[in-house]
Amino acid sequence: MWLDKGNIETLYAPKKRNYKKELFEAVKKFAINIAKKQSGFRKESRKILLESRKKSYDEIRDRIKTDSKVILFSTFDGRSYGDSPKAIYEYMLTQEKFEDYTFVWAFRNPKQFTFVLDNPNTYIVTVNTKDYEIAAATAKYWVYNYRMSDHIYPKDDQVYIQLWHGTPLKRLGYDINISDNAMNSKSEIREKYKVDASKFKYILAPSHFAAEKFISAWNLEAIGRTDTVLELGYPRNDFLANYTQKDIENIVSELQLPSDKKYILYAPTWRDNQHQAGIGYT
């Protein structure tokens, strides 16, 4: 299919120094630094890139038939394997009715996640490549916890499920009044959420509070799409409601922690006014 499992070692073997890629990354880093300071340059550059990428994707989408038994998964735009997409994927692997389905994971660095290929029905594509766009055009379902790429739109027979990745205690999208975001103005942020809201079929909310915030953040009431919000909870949280003492013991053992202590997890969110080229928001 998109990735020949038999050639994993060859595909990801050490390669000679790629000077063209290094030059591209240097130019990209330079452009990002300019974009932070010059909003006009940033907006015009993004507009040109979006139009070009959308035209290219539309050509792929128009010639590929949707496959009802192909599902595309992505976590944080391909940066990791986890959260609710992982929970849904791993649940589906245990269900006989999905034995003839094909699962495709999109990653930015596939080499880190080749373990998913242990399942014979699972494949990998690299985000923002032609293979990724072919997978998106083919899959009946898109299961994401972050916004889908702006230039990729679903066909009428495709279902984009927006799982998001948390409760919006911090303002999102249209709820942002003043933006100190390092890479986007308030209007640019709203445009991104506007595009996403026009694409997803469903967005899952973990609570009534979250459901209300999603409606306002994506401006769903104004566009008549409040019915897309499903207050069903996050699949990733099922484990927290059903864990056993053995699960706790396994975690403590794996992290090599003392078993006679109580633990507090501090997990601060990202800061949208801090952005480092090559890394992202920090």
Model-assigned labels for residue ranges:
Residues 63-72, 157, 259-262:
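A short, charged/proline- and glycine-enriched loop
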Residues 1-70, 94:
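Basic, ligand-binding patches in group-transfer machinery
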Residues 22, 112, 131, 246-250:
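Exposed alpha-helical structural elements
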Residues 37-49, 73-77, 235-239, 272-273:
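Acidic/glycine-enriched edge-of-secondary-structure segments
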Residues 70-242:
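Active-site and donor-binding regions of nucleotide-sugar-utilizing enzymes
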Residues 80-91, 217, 234-282:
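Conserved catalytic-core segment of nucleotide-activated headgroup transferases in glycan assembly
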